[in-house]
Every structure is written in structure tokens, then in C-alpha cells.
Amino acid sequence: MSNATNNTLGSLLPQLEAAANSNSLYGGMVPNLRFNITMIVIWGILLTIHVVQLLMRQYWFSIAFICTGILEVLGFIGRTWSHSNVADMDAFLLNMICLTIAPVFTMGGIYYQLAKLIEVYGHRFSLLPSPMAYSFIFICSDIVSLVVQAVGGGLCGVAVTDGTSTTTGNHVFIAGLAIQVASMAIFLMLWFHFLFRIYISVRWEHINSRPISLSLLKISQTEVDYLYREKFHFLRLEPKRWVFHYFNLAMTVAVLTIFTRCCYRLAELVVGWDGYLITHEWYFIILDALMMAIATVTLTIFHPGFAFKGRSTSIPITPGHVDPETLPHTDDVEDILDTSDSKQFDIEKEEFQASMKYPISTFKQFMSKIANLFSSKKKAKL
């Protein structure tokens, strides 16, 4: 009986110590060591896989997910570190900032895929003036969100170090998350509009009627494929290409899980640093860690490189509401099945360099700010 009591007290000791510590940054909660180490391993594996998947030449998507993987690993290292010292500001900031902004890069990779899907199905399904407008608008929005969140996190860190109020930093951080959530909500509306157009509207067009009936499901994708862009029919119709057939579903799952996670983070900060959500880790495990893991595993299996035949097919993003090959007095933009591997590489390289210029620069600046923040705090201690 005595041994059982001692074991129980021993298991509760970290929680009792944290609750008694007035400097605790988690409101008395101690991050679970086993769970956070497990997440470091899982994200390490996912990060390695996405490095290998760079070979599929979906550069934007893979680099975006690599950035996410790095931030998730760093964030869970911070939570593991916090297990032994819940009052350590460096560990808390590493956890809070990295895990909070990681989805910005995930969504950056996802936004670009909608532009590619519009190219595959046809420009007429785009609600915006150009497929690239989706990427440009939402990636710019994410960059703004990232910068605002980084500034808010930095202000909170400095305030705690100086022993002053974190109210301003917290409000800035919340504003950054609110921008991200609002941007994702608008993207979700545009995403479901696109799905409605390619799955419902084309069937109405095919039967020249607009019934609201389950009978529409009896019309196969093969029957309505003639209403899509002819140039990429080989991507859509090959029967064994299950990765492409379920790619839109995978994208939907990923976006909804990340959106759920971002709403949770926003609510967590609104409630406060010592509120109910941040002091009960199960909310974090289910609504943050699990949501991000589901999204990333889903798009690791249904990788755009597999869906779009990234090693042999180029899908350049072109402007306008009309498919380029249908315009009068114009030649095809390019042969999409190019036998020249070097030409294919050059095309993808140019697209990648153009699209990655600002996000990569922002990511470097952000990581530099984190390093400087930790460095200045350590100097202040000395």
C-alpha cells in the first residue's frame, strides 16, 4: 500500500510543483513528455519523407511542407523542454511561436494546388480572374498573418522577460491568427465553389437540367470528362490513378483539419495564457497536434507529385478565364509531356523560384527574429 502511495505521489509531483510555481507559463499544466517525444519522432519521419518527395518536383508544395515540418519539430522540442521547466521562457516561446505559425506554410503549399487543379479541369471553373490569383491572394494573406504573429510573439516574449504587461503582444498575436482564420474561411468558400462547379454544375450541363437529386451521383466522371479541359484528360481518366481520383477529397480533409486547428488556437489566445484551453493539454492534443498530423499525413500519401505526375508532366499556371490552347492565333503553351528532362526541370525551376522568393525570405527573417529574441534574453540574464 505504501509503495502504491509513493508511486502515485511520484507521478503527481511534476503537476504539483508546476501548480505551486507562480512563474509557470502553462497555468500549472505540465506538457506530457511521452506524447511530445512521440510527436517529434512522427514529424521527423514526415519531414524526411517530404525531403525525399522533392524528387517529385512539386517544389513549392514540398518546400512549404518542409518548413512546416521543421517548425513542428522545433515546437514539440520546446514542449518537451518545458516538461522539465515550465517557467523557462525560451522553451515556451519555441513551442508557442513555432507551433502557432506552422500551418501558414502548410496552407501556402495547399493554395498553389487549387491553381493547378483549375489548370487541369479548365479555366472556366475559376471564380477569380486567373488561377494564379488564388495563390497570390492567399499566400500574400498568409505572409501578412505570419509577420503579425511573429511580431506578437516577439512582443509577448520581451514583455515577459521585462516583467511588463503582455496585453499588447497578445492582441497583436490574436490579430495575426484572426487574419489567418478569416483568409482560410474565404479560401474554403472558394474551394467548395470549385468542387461544386466540377462535380455538380458539369452534370447539370451534361443532362441539360438542374435537378437536386442523388441521381446525379449515377453519372460517372468519365461521362462528363468531355466538359473539362482536353489537354489534361490523361491525368483524370487513367483508371488506376487513385491518387488523383481522391486528391480533391484529401485536399478537403487537409484544409478542414487545419482550419479546425487554427480556430482552436485563436480561441486559446482569446481565452488567455492562463485560460482553460491552454491549461488542459487534451485540447491541444486533439485540436492542434492531431489535426496537423491528419492534414500532413493525408497530403503525404496524396502528394501532388503523385496526383499530377510531377516527374513527367508540367502544369504551368496561366492567366485568364479561357484555356490558352483555345485562344485564336496562339500555339499551345508547351508540350505537357516533354521528353526533354532538362526542359521539364527548367520550367519547374522557374515557377518554383518565382513563387518561393517572398515566402522563403519571410521564413528566414522570422527564424532570425526568434534567434535574436532568445539571444537577447540570455544576454539580459547575464
Curated annotation (Swiss-Prot):
Keywords: Cell membrane, Glycoprotein, Lipid transport, Membrane, Transmembrane, Transmembrane helix, Transport
Name recorded for this polypeptide: Sphingoid long-chain base transporter RSB1
Family label: Belongs to the lipid-translocating exporter (LTE) (TC 9.A.26.1) family.
Glycosylated residues in this chain: 3, 6
Gene Ontology BP annotations: lipid transport
Induction: In response to loss of mitochondrial DNA in a transcription factor PDR3-dependent manner. Induced in response to altered glycerophospholipid asymmetry of the plasma membrane in a transcription factor PDR1-dependent manner.
Membrane topology term: Multi-pass membrane protein
Stretches assigned to the Cytoplasmic side: 56-57, 112-135, 193-241, 303-382
GO CC term, one of those recorded: fungal-type vacuole
